[in-house]
């Protein structure tokens, strides 16, 4: 599963995860980054590595 802690996430002003994810799991919807295609996640952890606020949790 891929979860975003919205208390930590800076949303579209950051969007590092959106840009970094090779599977395009994340997308911007309004003022939030959302997990749009969780089933496409390959657990590569790039999103976790690039997130400056540690807002993303990935569990197989």
From Swiss-Prot:
A single MF term (Gene Ontology): 4 iron, 4 sulfur cluster binding
What's in the keyword line of the UniProt record?
Answer: 4Fe-4S, Electron transport, Iron, Iron-sulfur, Metal-binding, Repeat, Transport
Q: Where is the 4Fe-4S ferredoxin-type domain?
A: 2-30, 31-60
The cofactors required by this protein are: [4Fe-4S] cluster
Record-listed [4Fe-4S] cluster 1 binding positions = 9, 14, 17, 51
Thermal dependence of activity, per record = Thermostable.
Keyword Electron transport tagged: yes
Q: Could you say which residues bind [4Fe-4S] cluster 2 here?
A: 21, 41, 44, 47
Q: Which InterPro entries match?
A: 4Fe4S_Fe-S-bd, 4Fe4S_Fe_S_CS, Fe-S_Ferredoxin
Query: A single Pfam family, by name?
Result: Fer4_10
Domain of life of the organism encoding this protein: Archaea
UniProt cofactor note: Binds 2 [4Fe-4S] clusters.
Per the record's keyword annotation, is Translocase included, yes or no? no
What does the UniProt record say this protein does?
Answer: Ferredoxins are iron-sulfur proteins that transfer electrons probably in the CO-dehydrogenase complex.
User: Per its UniProt record, what PANTHER family does this chain match?
Assistant: 4FE-4S FERREDOXIN-TYPE DOMAIN-CONTAINING PROTEIN, ADENYLYLSULFATE REDUCTASE, BETA SUBUNIT
The name under which this protein is listed is Ferredoxin
Species of origin:
Methanothermococcus thermolithotrophicus
